[in-house]
Amino acid sequence: FLAARRVGTGGRVIGVDMTIEMINKARGNAERVEAKNVEFRLGEIEHLPLADATADVVISNCVVNLSTDKPSVFAEAFRVLKPGGRVAISDVVAMKAIPHELTESLLAVAGCVGGAAQLTDVERMLTEVGFEDVRVTPRPESREVIAGWMPGTSAEDYVTSATIEATKPGGDCCEPTCCA
């Protein structure tokens, strides 16, 4: 609901989740905090239930690593963004090759480790779909937290939390309200 506060009463936030349980939970939370400018849609990150060029910002928190089709995730974000729109993602990325025992472990995949893409691959995928100003910023302070996810696996030696940002080209608006 941080996004709902950020866009103010004139803005609108659309939350997407692939499970009806999370949609219902989000709707209940929205009612509880009296958020009037939010709506929730059932959908997958690889097939967003939004029209082309309708969003100013696409935000995702620790979901991309769970997708088996990461290029489609980034292509969908590009599709739904207006020209000049931005992606802001917090996710787990690999800093080096992840051992097979972690990429094949259901616990590691569910724990956001096994499906993490290499940092350089994330940059490449974003650029290939057309994004500009691509920045993937590792967060080394996440090491201790990641170590606690799967004790004894050394997962923290392979992955880190990262902030992923990029811009869809074409936004030439000079007004202070554009994509704010």
Each language-model region and where it sits:
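Conserved SAM-binding loop of SAM-dependent methyltransferases across substrates and taxa
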Residues: 1-9
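A short glycine-rich, Lys/Arg-flanked "PGG" loop and its adjoining helix->strand segment in the class I
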Residues: 4-5, 71-86
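Conserved SAM/SAH-binding beta-strand->alpha-helix loop
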Residues: 19-21
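Conserved SAM-binding loop
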Residues: 26-27
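A short acidic, Gly/Pro-enriched loop at the edge of an enzyme's catalytic core
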Residues: 35-36, 46-58
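A short SAM/SAH-binding and catalytic strip from SAM-dependent methyltransferases
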Residues: 56-69
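Short, glycine-/aromatic-enriched active-site segment of Class I SAM-dependent methyltransferases
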Residues: 93-113
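C-terminal lobe and adjacent flexible extensions of AdoMet/dcAdoMet transferase-like proteins
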Residues: 125-180
